[in-house]
Amino acid sequence: MSRTSSAPSQKSLISRALKAERDVITASSQSQALDAAIDAAEHYMKALALTSSSKDRNVLDAKCKEWLTRAEKIKGSEDWRSVAQSRRSRLRTPASTRKLTTREDIILLQGAKLNGFIFPPWKAEPSLTEFETGTNGDVLFTDKPDLHLSNLQRDIFAGWKRPHELLSGQVDDAGMPLNPVMTVSGNTDLVQDVLTDCSVVASLCATTSRSERGLDDTLLPIVYPCIHNSMKSDISPSGKYIFRFYFNGCFRKVVIDDRLPSSKTSRSLYMIDRNHRNFMWPALVEKAYLKLRGGYEFPGSNSGTDLWVLTGWIPEQVFLHSDEVTADQIWSDLFKSFHSGDVLLTIGTGKLTEREQKELGLVSEHDYAILDMKELKGRRQFLIKNPWAGTDAVYPALFADPGPFPNSPFLSPGTFWMDCEMVLQNFENLYLNWNPGIFAYQEDIHFTWDLSTGKGMAGCFVKNPQFSVYTERGGVVWLLLGRHLRTIESRASEEDERFGFISIYVFKGGKRVALSDGALHRGPYVDSPNTLMKLDVPPRSTYTAVVSEESLPRVSQNFTISAFSDSPVRISHAPNKYICVTKVQGSWTPTTAGGNAESARYSLNPQFSIVLSDPTDISIVLEPSDQELATHVKLFWSGGKRIARVRSRDIVADSGDYRRGGSLVEKQDLDPGEYTIVVSTFAPDQYGSFTLWVSTNITCEVTQLPSEAAGRRAVLSDIGVLLPGQDRMLAPLTTPRLTRVKLIARSRESRIGNRPVGPSPLLMTVELGQGPYKEILATSEDGDHSDSISGVRVEDFDLQPGLEERGGVWIVLERIGGPGGQVEDHFEVEALGEERVEIGEWIVEDA
C-alpha cells in the first residue's frame, strides 16, 4: 500500500531533480548554479527515502553523491561554468534497432575488407584472454603485414620496435628508467613530426583536452585491454591492442600490435606526447587508425572525419566564410555544449600563400585542435593548438594578449588564444563532432549507389537514392550521410576518393522527387566522406531526403544514412509516387535539333506518342546527357500525331522555363486519350542524347514518332519572292503515279527595305485548274491565313497523274499584304510524297 501511494511522489521528486540539473547547466551566475545543484541533490535524497527497490536505491544514492560533489566543486571553483556544464559527459549512445535486410548485411560484410585487412563488425568487449602471451609468457603478438611507409619515411626508418625497445636507456626527471604507460596524470602535449596526419593528431588533442578539463576520466577512443572495472586503457602483456572504431556503417574491431616505426634520426615517425615520452596511447591509436586508412603514407583527411572514426561522434562541417555564419551564432551554438563535453572542436585553414603563412603564423591546409573556450567582459576566445612539432612558440600576428585571462596556465609551444572574430577571418573550416548520446534514438539504412552506369545530371534526381523520414512527435532530427571507405589501389585512386563531393537535399512529402527544384533544404557539397543535415520538423511529418553527388568515382559505392532524434524516428527507402515508369532514350541530331517553340524548326524536335486508357497522374522527366544543355518538355493534346505548330489551346502542360540539369512536367488527373510529348533544347543545332522518364499510375504506351519526312521523298521548290504589291504566286505540281503528298510552306526571309521583319500571314491551297472553274483540292490551316514561325501545312492529300488536260494541279501561296504593302516575302515549299513529285517554277500574279 505504501509503495503504491509513494510512487507518484517519488516520480515527482525525480522530475524536479532533473529540472534542477537543467537549471545548473543554464545558470547565469555561480550562486544560481550552486542553488540548483543543491536542489538536485536534495530532491534525489527525498526520492531515495521513498524507494524500496535495491536497484533504484543504488542509482539514486549515486545521484545524491554526484550532485553533492558537484555542488562543492561549483562553490570552490573559479571556473564554475565548466563544472556546472559537465552533466552530459557520459550519455548512453543510441543504436539503430531496425532489422537489416540481407542486402544490408552484405554491405556491412563488404565494408569489413579494407586496404588488405579485415575489420569485422564490433560484437562485444574483448576478454582479457585475448591479450595473454603464449604458454611460456614469451610469445608476443605480431600483426601482419607491416603497414606501408612513404619513401621519405623509409629514408629514416630504423625498423619496427616495441615500446620497451623505443624507451630503452631513457630515464625520467628522477633518473628512473622509463617504462611504457597507457594512462598519465597531468596535461598532455601531443604533436606530429614526420607524418602528414595533422588531422589525426588534432583529433586526439581534442579528445584528451576534454578529459583534462574534468569532463570524463576516460580517454576517447577506448583502447583494450582496460584496467579491471574501468574503461582506462592498460598495457597489453602480449603487445596486442584492440580498438572500437566507427566506419563503413558500424563500429568495427581493429587489431594492432604495439610495434612502432623507429627512426634513425631525432625525427619521430609516430605521434608523441612532449610531456610524457613514455605515453604510448597516442601512438597506438594513430597506428590503428592508419591501418584502416592504408598505412603511414596517409596524406591526411580532415579532423572531423577522423574523430568520427575514432569516437563515433556525429561529424559536422561549418564553412566559416559562409555569409550565414557569424561569430555570435558560432559562439552561442557551441559554448554550452563544449563545456558540457557534448562537442569536440577542431579547425582547419584553407590554401594560404607562403607570404600569408609567414604573416599570419598559420600553416596552409592544416588542422588545429580547439582546447578551450573562454568568455569574460565581452571577450570571446578559443584556445587553439597546432599539432605540428616544428611550430614556433608564438604567433605574432594572431596571438591574443592575456586580456581577461591573466591567470591562464602556461601555454605549450604552438598553443595560443585567438578571438572568435579572428578565427572566422583566418580559418576556413570548423569541424564539430557531437556526442550521439544527446539523442535518444537512431535509425540507419545501408545502401549501394551504382555510379558506374553513367553520371547523373546535376539537379536531376531520377537515379539518386532517396529516403522517407518520418517522426511522430516532431522536433529536432539530424540526418548523417556517410560514404564507406574503399581500398586505395593507387595514389591516383586515392586522389579520386578525396575529391568527390556529396550532399543531402530535403523535400516535403516522403515520396521520390525528380528534380532539385522545390527543395526545403539544400546541403553544401562537401569533399568529406560525411555530411550532416539538421532539421526541426513538426509532429507527424514526413520528408524526402535525397543523396546527391558531384565528381565521385564512377564505380559502385556503399553508403549509410542515419537519422538521430529525441523521439522515435523512421527512415526507409522513399516510395515512388507512380506505379509505372517507362524509360525512353533519344537524341538531338543535325536533323532533329529544332530549338525552342519560337524557332521555325521546332517541329523537327524528337516527339513521342503516349496513349492513356484511363485517367491518371503523370510525370515526365527529361534528362539530357550534357548538363550544359538547357531543355524543355511540352505535352500536347494531338491524337498522338506529330506537332507541326504550337497553339496554346493544344498545350496540356509544360516544364516552364528552359533549365539545365533536366526538365519536369507533372499533371494530375490527365484524361484518357492520345497525347504527344515534344522535347527541345533552347537553341537549334544543339546536339546530344537524352533519357525520357514517363511515370503514371496506369500502364501506358510511349513510342517515338517518326519524323515528318520518314518514308517520304522530299522535294524542295525554288524560292518564290513576293515583292511589295504582289500577294499571290503559284507553281505547278506533278507526279508520274498516284501518291500521298504533304506540303509545307516556310518563310526564308521577310524584309522592308534592308530591315528584317516577320513573315506576312500566308494561306496555301492546292488547286485543280485556274480561273472561275478551278477546284480546291486541299488547304492549309482550315482556310485561314497564318504567320506561324514553323510555316503553314497542307496535310496529306491524294495527287493523281495526268491532270494537265483539266488545267493541272497548282500550289498557290496567297499572303495578306494589303494595298501598298511594303513587305518583301521569300517562301519555299517542301513536298513530302510517297512517290517523287515535281514542283515547277513560281508564277507571280500582280495585284
Curated annotation (Swiss-Prot):
The lineage of its organism: Eukaryota, Fungi, Dikarya, Ascomycota, Pezizomycotina. CDD domains: CysPc, MIT. Its EC number is 3.4.22.-. Required for the proteolytic cleavage of the transcription factor pacC in response to alkaline ambient pH. Probably is the signaling protease that mediates the first proteolytic cleavage within the signaling protease box of pacC, yielding the 53 kDa 'open' conformation intermediate protein, which is committed to further processing. Required for virulence in invasive pulmonary aspergillosis (IPA). The keyword Hydrolase applies. It is an enzyme of class 3 (hydrolase). GO terms for molecular function: calcium-dependent cysteine-type endopeptidase activity; cysteine-type endopeptidase activity. It comes from Emericella nidulans (strain FGSC A4 / ATCC 38163 / CBS 112.46 / NRRL 194 / M139). GO terms for biological process: cellular response to pH; penicillin biosynthetic process; positive regulation of penicillin biosynthetic process; proteolysis; regulation of secondary metabolite biosynthetic process. It holds the Pfam family Calpain_III. The keyword Magnesium does not apply. InterPro entries: Calpain_cysteine_protease, Calpain_domain_III, Calpain_III, Calpain_III_sf, MIT_dom, MIT_dom_sf, PalB/RIM13_Calpain-like, Papain-like_cys_pep_sf. Belongs to the peptidase C2 family. PalB/RIM13 subfamily. Keywords: Hydrolase, Protease, Thiol protease. This is Calpain-like protease palB. Residues 116-436 form the Calpain catalytic domain. Residues 1-84 form the MIT domain. GO terms for cellular component: ESCRT III complex. The active site is at 198, 366, 386.
